[in-house]
Amino acid sequence: NLLQFEKMIKKMTGKEPVVSYAFYGCYCGSGGQGKPKDATDRCCFVHDCCYGKVTGCDPKMDVYSFSEENGDIVCGGDDPCKKEICECDRAAAICFRDNLNTYNDKKYWAFGAKNCPQEESEAC
């Protein structure tokens, strides 16, 4: 669920997830449209696409099982749907970490939908 995703982001990036990512670019946070503005925004785009492929459970609400081992996140549990949600969140948290060098909150925080034209939207 979203609280678990926040824990993963904090673990991987050291950043406060809501402050740093909930209103970033065109895709981080609720919804999304337009063209991703940078690598971090693309992480969110891919995460949205990943959630879109999950069927049979609720990515934002269902609780899954994960652990931290040697600085990595390991998804566990027996429910394949919840494990899929976990893997979506894990991949996004790692993507955020791997793109910290280009994260630009001065440019893309609270970017707003008006700067993300619907006609520029990409398919998953």
Swiss-Prot record:
PANTHER family in the record: PHOSPHOLIPASE A2 FAMILY MEMBER (PTHR11716), PHOSPHOLIPASE A2, MEMBRANE ASSOCIATED (PTHR11716:SF9)
Protein family per UniProt: Belongs to the phospholipase A2 family. Group II subfamily. D49 sub-subfamily.
Swiss-Prot/TrEMBL catalytic activity: a 1,2-diacyl-sn-glycero-3-phosphocholine + H2O = a 1-acyl-sn-glycero-3-phosphocholine + a fatty acid + H(+)
Active site as annotated: 47, 89
Pfam families: Phospholip_A2_1 (PF00068)
Tissues in which the protein is found: Expressed by the venom gland.
Protein name (record): Acidic phospholipase A2 BA2
Principal localisation: secreted
InterPro entries reported for this sequence: PLipase_A2, PLipase_A2_Asp_AS, PLipase_A2_dom, PLipase_A2_dom_sf, PLipase_A2_His_AS
GO molecular function, one term: phospholipid binding
Nucleotide-binding keyword on record: no
EC number from the UniProt entry: 3.1.1.4
Keywords: Calcium, Disulfide bond, Hydrolase, Lipid degradation, Lipid metabolism, Metal-binding, Secreted
Subcellular location: Secreted
Organism, as annotated: Gloydius halys (Chinese water mocassin)
Superkingdom in the source lineage: Eukaryota
Function per UniProt: PLA2 catalyzes the calcium-dependent hydrolysis of the 2-acyl groups in 3-sn-phosphoglycerides.
PROSITE patterns listed in its UniProt record: PA2_ASP, PA2_HIS
Annotated cofactor note: Binds 1 Ca(2+) ion.
Enzyme class: hydrolase
Any one cellular-component term (Gene Ontology): extracellular region
